[in-house]
Amino acid sequence: MENQTEEDKNEQTANRNSQPEIKSEVAIRITMMPRDTNSHGTVFGGIILSYIDVAGGVEAVRRTGHDRFVTVAMKEIIFLQPVFIGDLVSFYAETTKVGNTSVSIRVVVEAQRFGSHGQSVRVTEAEVVYVAINQYREKVKIGK
């Protein structure tokens, strides 16, 4: 979409924000603190990525029963809105695929804005792939 207008981009963001919720429990919930910010005063994207990785790992263990995974890919990470100090950020995770040794997890991140009385906005989405390993860090089959 080479000639995409700003209006088109805003409409796509609005459509993403109005997508139905994923069918999962909250994997983790964190209040963002001043230590999490970048030089622009918003939460550093790397902090969000780190929590996405943790949330996806929680879901992988919860859905497969296997207790050791390593992250092998983070796909299509989309930062939709900034996150601010004081936001209560929820990381929802949903298993999208379980293979022989790997599991794919979709993570949706929502921020309840500080002082917003419960109103949340979708801020980030990602797809994360994990591979099951044993205590020797060797790839193993899931649940078998």
Predicted regions and their residues:
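Small beta-barrel nucleic-acid-binding modules, principally OB-folds
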Residues: 66-82
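A conserved, well-ordered hydrophobic junction motif at loop->secondary-structure transitions
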Residues: 36-51
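HotDog/MaoC-like acyl-thioester-processing domains
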Residues: 2-10, 16, 22-28, 84-85, ...
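Active-site helix/loop of acyl-thioester processing domains in fatty-acid/polyketide metabolism
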Residues: 47-66
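Short, charged beta-turn/beta-strand-edge "cap" motif at the junction between a beta-strand
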Residues: 76-78, 95-98
